[in-house]
Amino acid sequence: MDIDQARLTHLQQLEAESIHIIREVAAEFENPVMLYSIGKDSAVMLHLAKKAFYPGKPPFPLMHVDTTWKFRDMIALRDKQAKENGWDLIVHVNQDGVEAGINPFTAGSAKHTDVMKTEGLKQALNRHKFDAAFGGARRDEEKSRAKERVYSFRDKNHRWDPKNQRPELWNIYNGRIDKGESIRVFPLSNWTELDIWQYIYLENIEIVPLYFAAERPVVERDGMLIMIDDERILEYLTPEEKASIQTRKVRFRTLGCYPLTGAVESEAATLPEIIQEMLLTRTSERQGRLIDHDSAGSMEKKKMEGYF
């Protein structure tokens, strides 16, 4: 560590590293895109991209792969932010999946995720010919992400081979790819969940209200508290489940498709309270994602098939 780095706080060091990665990709690749999932990590990543190119706008579009089952608050914030900031926002929906009636209930979490997220993402990347895609994944989230490089190389079919990763020495990244290949880039790789929350607090970044504890209607399914976000879910609940719907004070540590995302009971209704809760928690935020529990090593299998 040099003298200049020693003067930085750990969050400033993480910020500088992430901005360096974002600028490196923008300079090195012909057609990058930033995936915007509307969660807390995406909010931080986008904030860093805005800083990286201030006073100009980021020189790449944002893209949201919409499964049609996202929380309404997520879509509202996405549209509000895009309008206020004048972003070039691409929203892609896998229409083949919609026409086939794929949903989290009748198709199951694994097939729904594969068709509406993985295949939807691959469709969008192919259609727009993106050669690099930024994502907000962090190494502390899940074991398969812990061994993934900042530059995650994908073959012509968007598949990831965990045994064929390039070395990354210091801040030197090898972005050479053949025609048809691409990379997924993770500028937040070295951040932790606590780092994310502290940075959101310090930088006053707007996030989805679902991260804050509030009274919300929930039903217990598969050992998880699932929020009743709209009426579509009601036709898939059993009479017993409908009778057990209750209002509890809950929040979300992670956000995805609402029927596949579990809430946690919490009193943390402000950013300082969330940070305090993070200091005491001993569980991963990904425990609230049903797709991570489909089978042993399910996340790694999904990533090898093209999942982000």
UniProtKB/Swiss-Prot annotation:
Q: What pathway annotation does it carry?
A: Sulfur metabolism; hydrogen sulfide biosynthesis; sulfite from sulfate: step 1/3
Enzyme Commission identifier(s): 2.7.7.4
Which InterPro entries does the record associate with it?
A: PAPS_reduct_dom (IPR002500), Rossmann-like_a/b/a_fold (IPR014729), SO4_adenylTrfase_ssu (IPR011784), Sulfate_adenylyltrnsfr_sub2 (IPR050128)
Q: Name one Pfam family in it.
A: PAPS_reduct
**Top-level EC class as recorded in UniProt:** transferase
NCBIfam families given in the database record: CysD, PRK05253.1, PRK12563.1
Which keywords appear in this protein's UniProt record, sorted alphabetically?
Answer: ATP-binding, Nucleotide-binding, Nucleotidyltransferase, Transferase
Q: Single Gene Ontology BP term?
A: sulfate assimilation
Question: From which residue to which does any coiled coil extend?
Answer: none
Q: Name one GO molecular function term.
A: ATP binding
Identify its protein family. Answer: Belongs to the PAPS reductase family. CysD subfamily.
Could you tell me what this protein is called? Sulfate adenylyltransferase subunit 2
Subunit architecture: Heterodimer composed of CysD, the smaller subunit, and CysN.
Q: Which reaction does it catalyse?
A: sulfate + ATP + H(+) = adenosine 5'-phosphosulfate + diphosphate
CDD domains in UniProt: Sulfate_adenylyltransferase_2
Role, per record: With CysN forms the ATP sulfurylase (ATPS) that catalyzes the adenylation of sulfate producing adenosine 5'-phosphosulfate (APS) and diphosphate, the first enzymatic step in sulfur assimilation pathway. APS synthesis involves the formation of a high-energy phosphoric-sulfuric acid anhydride bond driven by GTP hydrolysis by CysN coupled to ATP hydrolysis by CysD.
Gene3D superfamilies in the record: HUPs (3.40.50.620)
